[in-house]
Amino acid sequence: MNAFDADITEHADSSGCHPLFRDVPATVEFNKLRKRLLRLTRQAIEDFAMVKPGDRWMVCLSGGKDSYGLLALLLDLKWRGLLPVELLAVNLDQGQPNFPKHILPDFLTRYGIEHRIEYQDTYSIVTDKLPETSTYCSLCSRLRRGNLYRIAREEGCSAIVLGHHREDILETFFMNLFHGGRLAAMPPKLLNDEGDLMVFRPLAYAAEDDLEKFANAMQFPIIPCDLCGSQDGLQRNAMKAMLIDIEKRMPGRKDTMIRALTNVRPSHLLDRKLFDFAGLMANGEKGSDDALW
């Protein structure tokens, strides 16, 4: 048992668990999955110094498996005394057609979770400004981001917490590599342009497959997205398919890729802004010939 697992076990509340987990069958498989996700979530929170005691986090809840999982895991860590922050669940209802407005309020109220449901019809703005053949993601995300920043300020939150996972980060990395000509992924911790809000991604180490299994076991009332993920021809879909193929051919490569993003060597890349190649010259001191092999 590693340190993270030991802490999670030791800090289990004597009263049992958060109400979210009380009706979930505690099978051996589920307990292992839950502990693994808790460990990876807490590890990301610690690795990237997300916690400042007394902070108030706004947890964005879309109704998808990832955001449900994020909220449940953060509530679980808080219940165990391992996350000393306030949590506010926020859903931005963007006016998408056939969006079931009752599901999230009913779910959050049933389990006594502090929340806010905000209605802003950004869907009509997107569809009015863009032709049907266009991809809505960019404009939709800009409108959503502006509203989330506003809500966070109104609610006195210090951070916006998002449910992006390992695969989201890797897909973004390859999109930037293949289409943007740069090495960049999703940051696990980001300061907004105004400098007053942090953005956190505590699921940075968590696998999408695990989050899907977790959501199924928890029986979250999933709300499907009628926009972003269902539009054909997205670059992200191509990256997702590529990663699935790589993992199928060479199991474990996704974990290796994530580790690579934590182990960057600027001297072995070509970016002169990150490494002083001009100042590097033979002076009798030992260097590194790793790049030869």
Curated annotation (Swiss-Prot):
Binds 1 [4Fe-4S] cluster per subunit. The cluster is chelated by three Cys residues, the fourth Fe has a free coordination site that may bind a sulfur atom transferred from the persulfide of IscS. GO terms for molecular function: 4 iron, 4 sulfur cluster binding; ATP binding; magnesium ion binding; sulfurtransferase activity; tRNA binding. Its EC number is 2.8.1.-. It catalyses: cytidine(32) in tRNA + S-sulfanyl-L-cysteinyl-[cysteine desulfurase] + AH2 + ATP = 2-thiocytidine(32) in tRNA + L-cysteinyl-[cysteine desulfurase] + A + AMP + diphosphate + H(+). Its cofactor is Mg(2+); [4Fe-4S] cluster. It is an enzyme of class 2 (transferase). A motif (PP-loop motif) lies at residues 62-67. GO terms for biological process: tRNA thio-modification. It is found in: Cytoplasm. [4Fe-4S] cluster binds at residues 137, 140, 228. Keywords: 4Fe-4S, ATP-binding, Cytoplasm, Iron, Iron-sulfur, Magnesium, Metal-binding, Nucleotide-binding, RNA-binding, Transferase, tRNA processing, tRNA-binding. SUPFAM superfamilies: Adenine nucleotide alpha hydrolases-like. It holds the Pfam family ATP_bind_3. Pathway: tRNA modification. It comes from the Bacteria. GO terms for cellular component: cytoplasm. The thiolation reaction likely consists of two steps: a first activation step by ATP to form an adenylated intermediate of the target base of tRNA, and a second nucleophilic substitution step of the sulfur (S) atom supplied by the hydrosulfide attached to the Fe-S cluster. Homodimer. NCBIfam families: PRK10696.1. Belongs to the TtcA family. Catalyzes the ATP-dependent 2-thiolation of cytidine in position 32 of tRNA, to form 2-thiocytidine (s(2)C32). The sulfur atoms are provided by the cysteine/cysteine desulfurase (IscS) system. This is tRNA-cytidine(32) 2-sulfurtransferase. The lineage of its organism: Bacteria, Pseudomonadati, Pseudomonadota, Alphaproteobacteria, Hyphomicrobiales.
